[in-house]
Structures are given as structure tokens and as C-alpha cells.
Amino acid sequence: MARILIVEDDSDLNNAYKIILENEGYDVVSVFNGQEALDALKTFNPDLILLDLLMPVMGGLQFLQEYELDKHKQVKVLIFTNMENSPEVNEAYNLGAHRAIIKSWTAPQNLTRVVDDALGNGSAATTGNK
């Protein structure tokens, strides 16, 4: 099953996403900011990263700059945000993100469909597609 890295500072959402995806059989590591994500990536090689944009310590955009997705083309990144069509979302696309998921439109229980779609295993409604 696919490996997923969750990078979300809201502990309730982080925990809910982790439980849901683990229950579906995914190998999941979850962290709370971009710096923790960079640290986790030293030992965990995900197929998909679910990335919040606005976080303390290191936000999603800075993480994307540091991670250099062009060197990790096999990894897909979905941005979690509440900012549809914002400059930050556009910048995330420029840095290699594949899609933006509006948090308020994607209930935690629908996360599996979104992930399956991103990994090529299904179809789900999202706000953007690179």
C-alpha cells in the first residue's frame, strides 16, 4: 500500500487523517510542520504528501522550497488549505504541488477518495489540478 506523509499543524485534523488513512491500509507518518516533515523524509519515502500551507516553524511553501520536488518527481503533493485561488496556492503549484484541497470542502471521512484519486486509484472532487 502507498506511503503517505501528513504535514498538518491542527492536531485534531492530523490525528483524524492519520487514523482514517491507516484504517484503509496506508503506511502513514504524520508531523506538525515543515521542519518536522523534512526530518521525517530522512527515513520515510512517501508516495504522497498531504501538506498544510500555513503552519508554525516552517509553512508549506518553505517546505516545498527546501524539499525541491523537481528532485522527487515520483512524490505527489496535495496542498491542504482554506485559501482557494490564493497567491500562496499558485506559488505551491509553481513549486510542484499537484492539487489544492480546500479543507472546509473535504470532510475527513472523504479523505480516502481524495488520496485514491491522487494516487490514480479513483476519482474525487478537488479545487485544482496542475
Roles of regions detected by a PLM:
Residues 39, 61-73:
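Short amphipathic alpha-helix used as the core "switch/output" element in two-component signaling
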